[in-house]
Amino acid sequence: MSSIKIECVLPENCHCGESPVWEEASGSLLFVDIPGKKFCRWNPLTKAVQRMTMDAPVTSVALRKSGGYVATVGTKFCALNLEDQSVVALATVDKDKKNNRFNDGKVDPAGRYFAGTMAEETAPAVLERHQGSLYALFPDHQVKKYFDQVDISNGLDWSLDHKIFYYIDSLAYSVDAFDYDLQTGQISNRRSIYKLEKEEQIPDGMCIDTEGKLWVACYNGGRVIRLDPETGKRLQTVKLPVDKTTSCCFGGKDYSEMYVTCARDGLDPDSLSRQPEAGGIFKITGLGVKGIPPYSYAG
């Protein structure tokens, strides 16, 4: 196996960087800074960063088949245009919960945009419990609510055969699986496939590789872990020089590089001096596995 190399490729100083997505068409990495209310597109070749500031926390971003992007902003599913900096609301959720916001989101293989909510935090990972729900924005802009009683709706992805939906509610310290019906978007038969170890801390963002194994970013754990969803075993741990790793995706040529986002918020001055790259974008090469291209929202 080739040697693993970890480097901070963009010192962005995100309060809480999240939702990395590779955009093959532009050879760029998309990501957000949730408290910074920013959506960013970074081109590793030219080093150019395009930024777009919102009026509410922007928590996830995804590609859109018809062009531009979709994002979760506050409690709204929105369409974004980076060129003219426009934001168009497509749907709103949790109207009865004024203290809620979206968190992580991702598009399924049929082009539906799944995203979940949570209560606003009073400090990182400190919040009113059981206030969140999981939703999906269908291509016709209708919203389906799947379940509620969620603490921090987080990482999500689908198995390579599209028959299993993987999902993380962070404060359950578990990676869960559901049976998935791609035709209808229905989920059923929830079960836990991996419980995090104490030193792994809080499960956050997640992605899948071409071997069907899951990669989970561990918030406060300073690592990404590779899991076998069939055996429930951890296969690999890759530690980063920052504590608050938040999410991960594959990208670059052939999707052979992993990009990892992280946070600065919640670190005291002493911790920040020890990890000056906190809030940056990290690239991991030499993992010996590849990812799959992200799906695009079909609406």
UniProtKB/Swiss-Prot annotation:
The modification N6-succinyllysine is found at residues 144, 244, 253. Its cofactor is Zn(2+); Mn(2+); Ca(2+); Mg(2+). Keywords: Ascorbate biosynthesis, Calcium, Cytoplasm, Hydrolase, Metal-binding. It catalyses: D-glucono-1,5-lactone + H2O = D-gluconate + H(+). Binds 1 divalent metal cation per subunit. Most active with Zn(2+) and Mn(2+) ions. The physiological cofactor is most likely Ca(2+) or Mg(2+). It is found in: Cytoplasm. One of its GO terms (molecular function) is zinc ion binding. The active site is at 204 (proton donor/acceptor). A divalent metal cation binds at residues 18, 154, 204. InterPro entries: 6-blade_b-propeller_TolB-like, Regucalcin, SGL, SMP-30. Its main location: cytoplasm. GO terms for cellular component: cytoplasm; nucleus. Belongs to the SMP-30/CGR1 family. PANTHER family: REGUCALCIN. Gluconolactonase with low activity towards other sugar lactones, including gulonolactone and galactonolactone. Catalyzes a key step in ascorbic acid (vitamin C) biosynthesis. Can also hydrolyze diisopropyl phosphorofluoridate and phenylacetate (in vitro). Calcium-binding protein. Modulates Ca(2+) signaling, and Ca(2+)-dependent cellular processes and enzyme activities. This is Regucalcin. It comes from Oryctolagus cuniculus (Rabbit).
